[in-house]
Amino acid sequence: MMSIDITTNHKIIFGDARKMDEIEDESVHLVVTSPPYPMIEMWDELFKMLNLEINKRWMEMENEEDEEKKEKLIMQIYNLMHQTLYPVWEEVYRVLVPGGIACINIGDATRKINGVFRLFPNHSKIIENFEKIGFVTLPYILWKKPSNKPNAFLGSGFLPPNAYVTLDVEYILIFRKGKPRKFKPKDPLRYASAYTKEERDRWFSQIWEIVGDKQTHPKIERRTASFPEEIPRRLIRMFSIIGDTVLDPFLGTGTTVKAAIELKRNSIGYEIDKSLKPIIEEKIGIKQKRIGMDFNVEFINRG
């Protein structure tokens, strides 16, 4: 990869990504994000806050005695959670350039509600919604998280038939806005962004084995659900060139912005939780002198 001197700009907005008024149409080249996972317990309260109808149906479900009606309410809640994310995906389509790529890290959910254990296939719901908006679905990546822990098999242990398969992969879904992006012949920034044969062979295989990131941070006593830096680093190298703009509408602790800075891409991040600001500042090294990196960071607080 050739060395290119470039000053990059990074904008971190504390606000709801369902309206990204700060971003112009067709001005983003790549989206890398991991949204809240519907029907994963740690995200229940956030979804209830973002969509009061979810809170209402949840209370109805807990008070309902008829099993058939409970079942319907559970599926209504699941669908409402995905409907809550849908405006973000519409905004992603609006801001992407023609040929721009969106990479969505999502896991399916397993959960026992009202005594019934079930799978909630989040990845298929995301694909359905992206295609409804107009995206082209590309082959996805399976992120397998290696673990030294013995598998926590669910169900009846060694006795068939009532045990359940353990979910040990997440999906990195890949979508494109329209036809492939076009470049000028011998574009210097594109050539400077090239990866090696070894990188290509490893990155473009469907299964990635990457150790998951810590889910807690010492400065806040709760889970942050951040993905490991290796994931946005690979995706940014694979699907953008130096000088491009990368968007993460669910920024969390700032992993995508950090990777964008180090890979000489511009970036924009949205985060609804303002308390994460000091963690983001620490992660991206805003108070540190970074050798060989020239970048500007702007924080915006919506009123």
Swiss-Prot record:
Stated name of the protein: Type II methyltransferase M.MjaI
E.C. number(s) listed in UniProt: 2.1.1.113
One Pfam family this sequence matches: N6_N4_Mtase
Family under the similarity heading: Belongs to the N(4)/N(6)-methyltransferase family. N(4) subfamily.
EC category name: transferase
Top-level taxon of the source organism: Archaea
GO function terms (MF aspect): DNA binding; methyltransferase activity; N-methyltransferase activity; site-specific DNA-methyltransferase (cytosine-N4-specific) activity
GO BP terms in the entry: DNA restriction-modification system; methylation
Any one cellular-component term (Gene Ontology): cytoplasm
Keywords assigned by UniProt, alphabetized: DNA-binding, Methyltransferase, Restriction system, S-adenosyl-L-methionine, Transferase
Catalytic activity: a 2'-deoxycytidine in DNA + S-adenosyl-L-methionine = an N(4)-methyl-2'-deoxycytidine in DNA + S-adenosyl-L-homocysteine + H(+)
